[in-house]
Structures are given as structure tokens and as C-alpha cells.
């Protein structure tokens, strides 16, 4: 039986709405991975269980505190850069304090078992790698690196953090602990007293090595991800609303090639109508269940699998056949984030 047939069969045997954990509710996902050679596209929803918020909740409504910095703002305004680095400096300790969750460990276990052809992540937190995953393409870059916009040299964020602390010994945020956003910065009003540092090699402007809103994803990276999807037997989307074209285009490409797409997300996504099957469920417990179903160990150092600790239990899970989205949110021109 082909992967397309197997996924379709599992999907058709599921009710559209189930409450509480249903073993068959993740059968379609387990079946997809059982065939192997599956590409994974992950989004912010995979990291929420690690304490890093996503841009949109289950309702699909944006819930970021403040507007994200655009590339044009960052490069065109000294004040904008000062504001960004002050906020990001505070948010950085939150990012470095985050640990991989059951979802990340499940993905690493599936990859280690040879069932994953590659991982494309829209996240910039590095948690896939921290969980032990190896074949990871960071579509939007990484907060753990910094790039100079003049000489293009790259350095670690840890090094920059030390320089920022040295340059701002008396700088503190007033008030309560600020809310952290998905891109690692925080909501902070007063930033005028913050000192920004430049490249140690040439004195140029430093930027986190991530793709800002309004900035292009590097073409070689885009094409490498297209090649991965085209050469895989299936595409599984984990925790992405697919609101922006940078992720949606891979679902569209897989669909156009007849490659089955399974989407696991809490809430609807922009790609649901193209999916072979969709599953509305928490990522951690779902991937834990899949790993157990396939007889694998997760990527913890002791190889154990703790369902109770990772919240495996009650919840609401919805698996549905492909459906049309009544409202599609169009973002970007197809080439941008």
C-alpha cells in the first residue's frame, strides 16, 4: 500500500470531531512516518510547550505584544536598532533558558530511526538541534548567530550578549518582567538609554542572523527546501498556521506533486485545504504517542519515554479530511516571509 493510500485510509476511518485522547486520532500521523522518507516542516506551535509563544493562538488571531521589527525599519533607523537590541537583550535570557519539549524530542527520535528525510523549521530558537536532530534547515535563520551587514562576518549571540552587558552595566528594565515575543524580544517602552555595539571586525551594523519581516529568505535555502520536499514521500507540518508564504509554498509544492501532506496544529491553517489529513492536537503528546506507537525511544539521554510528565492525556483532537478555508490571509508576495 502506498503512503497516499495508507494516509487516506486512516483519515477516512476517523470521525471529524473527537473529545479526549483517541488512539486512532494519531494513527494517520503514525502511518505517514511508518513509511519513512518524510520531510517535516515545523513552526512556532512546536515550541510553545517550551515556553516560547507563537504569533497566533488556536483561533488564528495574532497575539504578539507589539509589532515585529521589519528589515526596513532595522536598517533605516538608529532608534529602531536601539529599540530592537534593548528588547532582544532582555528576551535573550528567556530564549537561552528554553529547553526542548516532548515534540522536539519526538522529531529527533523519528529522525534517529531513519524515518525523516529532513527538517525544515520556521523557528529561530535552535530547539530541534538541542533535542538531538541533525538534518535541520533553519528557514528563517537562528537567534543564536549574529551577522554584520557590512562585512557579513558571523559570530555567536553569546559573544554579543557579553558585549552588550559590558556596554550597559547600569541598564535595567523598569517594572515587571516583560512579555517575551516569538522572535525573542520583549515589550519594553523605554530604550533610549541602551548602548548598541557594532561589528568588532569592521564597525558595521550587527543584525541577528534571522529573516526579518519584509526580508527575503535566501534563494539557495528556499531551493534546497523545495528539493527536500520533492524528493520525500510525504510532508508533515508541525505547529505552523502557514500564514506566511515562506512555509505555505512547500505545502503547495507537495500538493502539486501529489505528495501527501499531514498537518498537525492547534487551530486551522492556511494550508488545510491542500492537506491529505489534518489533526488539531497538542504537539508534545501527539508526537510522544506516535513515537510509542512505532516502538521508538525519544531523544532523552536515558532513552526513556515519559508520557505522564509530558502531559499525555485529556484534550480535544480533531482530524478532518481536506476542507476549504473560508478566509485566507494573504501575506507577502510569495518570496518573502
PLM region descriptions:
Residues 1-337:
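Conserved catalytic core of sirtuin-type NAD+-dependent deacylases
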Amino acid at each position: 500500500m502506498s503512503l497516499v493510500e495508507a494516509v487516506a485510509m486512516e483519515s477516512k476511518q476517523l470521525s471529524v470531531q473527537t473529545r479526549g485522547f483517541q488512539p486512532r486520532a494519531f494513527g494517520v500521523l503514525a502511518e505517514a512516518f511508518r513509511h519513512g522518507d518524510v520531510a517535516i516542516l515545523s513552526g512556532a506551535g512546536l515550541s510553545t510547550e517550551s515556553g516560547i509563544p507563537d504569533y497566533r493562538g488556536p483561533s488564528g488571531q495574532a497575539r504578539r505584544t507589539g509589532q515585529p521589527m521589519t528589515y526596513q525599519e532595522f536598517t533605516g533607523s538608529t532608534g529602531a536598532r536601539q529599540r530592537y537590541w534593548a528588547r532582544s537583550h532582555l528576551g535573550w535570557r528567556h530564549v537561552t533558558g528554553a529547553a526542548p519539549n516532548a515534540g522536539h524530542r519526538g522529531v529527533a527520535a523519528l529522525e534517529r530511526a531513519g524515518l525523516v528525510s529532513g527538517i525544515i523549521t520556521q523557528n529561530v530558537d535552535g530547539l530541534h538541534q538541542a533535542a538531538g536532530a541533525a538534518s535541520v534547515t533553519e528557514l528563517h535563520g537562528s537567534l543564536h548567530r549574529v551577522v554584520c551587514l557590512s562585512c557579513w562576518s558571523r559570530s555567536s549571540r553569546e559573544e554579543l550578549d557579553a558585549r552588550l552587558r559590558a556596554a550597559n552595566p547600569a541598564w535595567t528594565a523598569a517594572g515587571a518582567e516583560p512579555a517575551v515575543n516569538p522572535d525573542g524580544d520583549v515589550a519594553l517602552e523605554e530604550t533610549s538609554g541602551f548602548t548598541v555595539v557594532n561589528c568588532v571586525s569592521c564597525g558595521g551594523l550587527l543584525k541577528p542572523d534571522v529573516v526579518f519581516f519584509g526580508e527575503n529568505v535566501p534563494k539557495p535555502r528556499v531551493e534546497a527546501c523545495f528539493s527536500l520536499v520533492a524528493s520525500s514521500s510525504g510532508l508533515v507540518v508541525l505547529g505552523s498556521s502557514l500564514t506566511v508564504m515562506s512555509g505555505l509554498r512547500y505545502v503547495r509544492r507537495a500538493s502539486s506533486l501529489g505528495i501527501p501532506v499531514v498537518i498537525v496544529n492547534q487551530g486551522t491553517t492556511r494550508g488545510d485545504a491542500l492537506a491529505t489529513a489534518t489533526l488539531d492536537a497538542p504537539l508534545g503528546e501527539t508526537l510522544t504517542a506516535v513515537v510509542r506507537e512505532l516502538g521508538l525511544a525519544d531523544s532523552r539521554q536515558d532513552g526513556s519515554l515519559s508520557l505522564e510528565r509530558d502531559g499525555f492525556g485529556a484534550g480535544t483532537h480533531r482530524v478532518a479530511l481536506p476542507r476549504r478555508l473560508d478566509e485566507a490571509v494573504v501575506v507577502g508576495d510569495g518570496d518573502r516571509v
